[in-house]
Amino acid sequence: MSRDDQLFTLWGKLNDRQKDNFLKWMKAFDVEKTYQKTSGDIFNDDFFDIFGDRLITHHFSSTQALTKTLFEHAFNDSLNESGVISSLAESRTNPGHDITIDSIKVALKTEAAKNISKSYIHVSKWMELGKGEWILELLLERFLEHLENYERIFTLRYFKISEYKFSYQLVEIPKSLLLEAKNAKLEIMSGSKQSPKPGYGYVLDENENKKFSLYFDGGAERKLQIKHLNLEHCIVHGVWDFILPPP
C-alpha cells in the first residue's frame, strides 16, 4: 500500500475532532520558515530540514521553547535520520556528555530566557557544584575536570520575536575557549548575603577585555553558570526562523 493510500485509510478511521487536529498538525509544516546552515562539519543539509521540522512539530502543541530533554531527543533523532551515527548517553544524570556523535562525546545546553541576548550566551546551569568545600580555586578545578568528559559543546538558543514569530540558533561553544578558564581571575563576592558567598572567574583576552565569566552560584542549587560569553568567540552552525499563521 502506498503512502497516500495509507493516509487515506487512516483518515477514514478518524472522528471529526481527530481530523481537525490532524489538519492543524499538517498545516504546521506549511508555515513561513527559513532553515539556514551557516557553518560546521557534523551537520548535513538533511539534518537542518529534519531538525527544523521537529521544531515546528513541537510548536504545533506548545508555545514554550524546546526543553533540554526534548532538545536532546530531537537532536539525536534528527542526526540519525540524516545519516549521522548518534546515541544519547545511557544515564540521564550523567555528569558529563549528553550524546555521542560519530564516537565524539558532546555536551548539550539550551537557552530560552525572555531577555536573551543576541550577542552574549548565558548558560544558567553548566554543572552542579555539590556540597564540598566552597573554595573558588577548588571549584574552578572541578569545572576543568568536568570539561574532560566531552569534546564538543552545542547550545540551542530560542528567540521569541513576537506572538507568532520565533527563531532557534544552534551554536557551538569551543572547548578550547572554555579551557582558558584555567587562568581565570577569581573574585569572591564578599558583600553578598548568600551563604556560601558566590564568586566570579573572569576570563580575559590579551587586552584585558572579558571573553566570558564563570559564576559560582552559592544558592540552594550550588551550581556553575557561564555568563556574558561573547558570540563572536563561538560558531553558529545554523538558524531556523518561523512565522506561524494566526489562529
UniProtKB/Swiss-Prot annotation:
<keyword id="KW-0255">Endonuclease</keyword>
<protein>
    <recommendedName>
        <fullName>Type II restriction enzyme SmaI</fullName>
        <ecNumber>3.1.21.4</ecNumber>
    </recommendedName>
</protein>
<keyword id="KW-0540">Nuclease</keyword>
<keyword id="KW-0460">Magnesium</keyword>
<dbReference type="GO" id="GO:0009307">
    <property type="term" value="P:DNA restriction-modification system"/>
</dbReference>
<dbReference type="GO" id="GO:0009036">
    <property type="term" value="F:type II site-specific deoxyribonuclease activity"/>
</dbReference>
<dbReference type="Pfam" id="PF17411">
    <property type="entry name" value="SmaI"/>
</dbReference>
<keyword id="KW-0378">Hydrolase</keyword>
<dbReference type="InterPro" id="IPR049519">
    <property type="entry name" value="SmaI"/>
</dbReference>
<keyword id="KW-0680">Restriction system</keyword>
